[in-house]
Structure formats: C-alpha cells, structure tokens
Amino acid sequence: RTTQKVKVIEIIYVMDANSGTEKELWIKAGAIILEAVKFIERANIRIKLSVCMYFAKSGNEIAISTVKIKDFGDKLDLQKVCFPMAHPSMFRRIGFRWIETHPDIKEYGWSSGYGRSLSEDGKELTEYIKTPVHAYSISAHQIKKMDFDVIKVLNHFNCLKK
C-alpha cells in the first residue's frame, strides 16, 4: 500500500476597499473566487479558504482580521460560504464593527475613519502575516484587474498545469 500525498492550497480572499467601492465588486469577485475553489477541488486539491475582511492602516497601526470559512477537509457548502465571500455587508458591517470594538486598536486616526486599504495600495496580505508556502492571498481589486476571469485567478494560485 502506498500513501498518496494530498495537495493543499490555502486561499485568503481580501475584501477590504475604500468607501467609494461599489457593492458589485465584492459580489462579482466573491463569485469568481468560489468558481475557482470549485475548479481546484474538482482537481483533487484540498482548499482552506479564509476571508480577510480588514486589511488597513492608520498612522503606525495595521489592522488585519481574517476568518476561516472552510478547512482543508470540509466540503464546499455554498450556503455557508456565499455570505462571507460575496456579500458587501461582511466587509461593511462586520468588518467595521470589528475595527470599532477591537481593544488593541489605539491609533487616533481610526476614530475619524476606517483607515486606508492596504490591498488598494498593492500590498499583499502575505507580506504581513505568516502563511505556509502553499498560501495565496488575492483581493477583490486584483480580481477586477484580472477582468473577473477565473482562469487568471487560477493562474494566480498556480493551479493550472503548464
């Protein structure tokens, strides 16, 4: 009997944005991520899926909030993952509430706003948090720059055979 190594990928979807962002961006980008996850899992690659609903800076403080949506062994349950992956309220209401009530957020600038989106500044979440080698972060803005093309997203995750 030979044991097979199971391929795994961790995806962290960053859904922060500035106040002028249209809700359609999150809906379309979230749908593309879920389409990519379905494709990857059909290729027998296990996915850990997290959403980062806050990735911003104010003064010298950086706020990062992530929530695990699906673990490697979990089946993809669209009923469970659609809200956190594609609904604007996940970022706007739950993300804002997190920043408003987090006890370690001390910088005065947070009181007059919600900080500056780091993903819009072209920063990668993986620059700020420790992740395994097989982890990828992608933002709604990156997906928009990829023309909401699932093939380009899969290439970003190195999931297509060359």
Regions found by a protein language model. Name each.
Residues 2-12:
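Short coil-to-beta-strand
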Residues 6-7, 17-23, 27, 31-34, ...:
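Acidic, glycine-rich A-domain
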